[in-house]
Structure formats: structure tokens, C-alpha cells
Amino acid sequence: MQSITVALDAMGGDFGPRVTVPAAVQALSHFPELKVILIGDQSLITSQLSQLGTSTSSRLSILHSEKVISNSEKPSLALRNSQNSSMRMAIDLVSDNEADACVSGGNTGALMALSRFVLKLLPGIERPALVSALPTISGKRTWMLDLGANVSCDADSLFQFAVMGSALAEEHLGRPPRVAVLNIGAEEIKGNDLVKRCAEMLSQTDAINFVGYIEGNQILHDVADVIVCDGFVGNVCLKASEGTAQLFIEKLKTSMMASTIKGWIARKLFSRLFNELKTLNPDQYNGASLLGLRGIVIKSHGSADVSAIVNALGEAVHEVKRQVPSRISDRLEAVLLERHY
């Protein structure tokens, strides 16, 4: 079995080593091929390992860093002051081929800027895009991009997002994914010039299985496998859907506590419903991919807990196995060749 090494920014996110270290330990038991390099304050990481009753090994190592990029730091400032930071060192390991992928829950803007600066973009890609899987009513997943890396885009960028998202989704699904553009209506006359131009470009491309427009209320209804939008719209949709899912789960918990139904009937009724709603938990889909780079970078939620970070590490393992950057490059080359002729 070929090993896969992931550089984990242990200081990234709201809770730092308190969640990243136990997540790394858990991930090693989930993925036998995985090796993790924890980058961050060595004393804090070692302390967390001691509390877990474990230590470094051939599959778990520590790389000490002196600095942490704060969530409030501007990307331009992060670029200038990134040396010896846990995030920069994690990305550098990928660039130096000492790690196959990196995972960070840190500052999203800084992560995008540093990744683009260090790893560079794939040929033909103008901007990287942030993509993540979302749950659907059928129990399957749909991938949505961009989720905030680019708050304003042109039609060419949206087209490239569609190509990248299609390549990623196909590696998960094993079939050509259905690609749709997010719009305010399903009719061809609806929408602004941006989405209309993107839809026109996609409809003329045989390499993309374009199924037309999708409205916001259809995002979680398994109508499309890949949903394309600019980063402003995508981030708002993502946060709204996550908040709605959390609302349902919390409401159910409150109802369970207040219920007058007793005994095994209550346990049966609420446990079944709770298990169904747990599939909407955003933590199960943690691990947004920064696509378009010459390396694999996974963005974890800043507020992610241990299980959510394990999922992000799992996404990194999957993308390394499937060689996602190469797949995207091949797909883009085929699409550009088709458009040229």
C-alpha cells in the first residue's frame, strides 16, 4: 500500500491543537495509508498528544512553527509575513514534494493567496475556486463552487469552475456529473449577463454534461451534481444551508427534551428522525477543495470539531489517490481543444 502524507496546519481554526491533534490521531486509524505531519507549536502539540496517551511515530510527526496567521490578517499582509507560519510551512511541504496534500482551517483568504503564490495555478486556469460537497434529499451529494474564493467573476471564470468541478465530481461519482448554473429562474431568459454567457459556453461544450439552470430551492434536491456560481453567491448559499441544517437539528433536540412521550416509543420516534437529520450536519461534509492549483489544498471549517477535521483529512486522501489536479488539467485541455476547433 502506497503511503499518503498530509501536512496538517495544527494551529489553524478556532480551536487549534485541541481539535487538530486528536483529529490527526483518529484519522490514522481510519486511513491505514495515511501519514500526518502536524505543523505548529511543538510544545502545544506534544501536550495534546500526551493527553491522548500517544506520541509521535513513523506515521505522525511534528514540524515546529513559530508563527500563526490570524483570521483577521489580510491576504496581502499574510503573503509578506508568512515565513515560519504553520499555514505557509504546510503549503511549502506540498510544493517541496514532502507532502501530498495540505489541510488547514485557518484564514481562507490567506490560504488562497499563499497556495496560489507557492503552488501556482494549473495551465489554463485564471483563478482557483473553493468547492465542497453538500447533502441532498436523496442521500447523495452535490458539489458547489465557488464558495467564497472569488466574490466577483467573469463568464470565463465560471466556465473554468464548471470544468474543475466536473472533474472532481466525476472522481467521486465514477460517471459524468450533471452540471448546472445557479440562477434566479430555470428559464433561459432569466438571470444576468454573467450566468447567461456562462450557460451559453457550457451548452456548446460536449465535454461537460450541462443540464441548464438551477434555482436556490433546488440545490439540495439532487437535480445536479455540480452547481456553479460566483463566490459571493456561493458563500451566502453555503452559510444559509448550514444554518438551516443546524436549526433543524437543534429544534429536534429541544423537542426531544420537552416531549411528553415516554419510554421506548419516544426513543424510537426521535432517534430515527435524529439519525435522518444528522445527514444534514455540515461537519460530515467538511473539507472544501481549493481547485485549480498544482497541488492539493483542503480548507477545513474554522469552527470544525474533531470528526469534521477527520473528514477533511479523508477528502485529502481521496484527492491524492485520484490525482485530482492531473484530472482537472486533462479535462481542461480537452475542453479548450474542443472550443478551439
Swiss-Prot record:
Assigned EC number: 2.3.1.274
Pathway(s) per entry: Lipid metabolism; phospholipid metabolism
Classification via InterPro entries: FA_synthesis (IPR003664), Phospholipid_synth_PlsX-like (IPR012281)
Compartment annotation: Cytoplasm
Domain of life of the organism encoding this protein: Bacteria
Predominant place of localization: cytoplasm
Catalytic activity: a fatty acyl-[ACP] + phosphate = an acyl phosphate + holo-[ACP]
Gene Ontology biological-process entries: fatty acid biosynthetic process; phospholipid biosynthetic process
Keywords: Cytoplasm, Lipid biosynthesis, Lipid metabolism, Phospholipid biosynthesis, Phospholipid metabolism, Transferase
Molecular function GO labels: phosphate:acyl-[acyl carrier protein] acyltransferase activity
Listed GO CC annotations: cytoplasm
Subunit: Homodimer. Probably interacts with PlsY.
Family: Belongs to the PlsX family.
Described purpose of this protein according to its UniProt entry: Catalyzes the reversible formation of acyl-phosphate (acyl-PO(4)) from acyl-[acyl-carrier-protein] (acyl-ACP). This enzyme utilizes acyl-ACP as fatty acyl donor, but not acyl-CoA.
HAMAP family per the UniProt record, alphabetical: PlsX
Protein name: Phosphate acyltransferase
Biological source species: Vibrio campbellii (strain ATCC BAA-1116)
Gene behind the chain: plsX
